[in-house]
Amino acid sequence: MQDCCFTHENNWFRYRAAGIIVEDGCVLFIGNEREDYLYSVGEGVHMGETAEDAVRREVFEETGVKYEIDRLAVIHENFFNENNGLLKGLDCHEIAFYYLMKPRGEKVLESDSYTVGHVKEQLRWIPIEELGNYKAFPSFMQDYLTHEHSGIEHIVTDERK
């Protein structure tokens, strides 16, 4: 299936769905050998797919677990640039729906996930209070997870260099 993304000249846009997975005071992120940062569990929404279906699919693909959605938590407008990889040199604009996933009560996961460029991914449980010590995206996650929220948050970040 085709992701909802496109490139026009030096601009790249993607519609993304991601899960916020918290177990025992830790939040789940993913890393890989190619990148020097961690990123949230999720990926591009496919054409004709709802964001809820996309987050269920991606969370399962990346963790091997069928987490249930608790609620839509954040709509994130993200502007950034990449210094390497497939997006090198592009001005990136991403709109992401972040869903809080229901905890399972355990952190045991089996991942056999790869990036679009076929690089093996590794799951990382990061203690929420230590998240600021990591280069992890989205950058708002530690602040979001340490405050109470009753509705859907709209967050805009601009990390273009």
Give each language-model segment a name.
Residues 1-18, 24, 89:
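Acidic, metal-coordinating catalytic segment for phosphate/diphosphate chemistry
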Residues 11-13, 87-95, 115-120:
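A generic structural micro-feature
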Residues 80-110, 144:
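Active-site-adjacent beta-strand/loop module that shapes the phosphate/pyrophosphate-binding cleft
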Residues 23-65:
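Conserved Nudix-box catalytic region and its N-terminal flanking loop in Nudix hydrolases
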Residues 21, 98-102, 125-127:
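Short, well-ordered beta-strand micro-motif
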Residues 25-27, 35-36, 46, 75-81, ...:
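Short, charged/polar surface micro-motifs in flexible loops or helix N-caps
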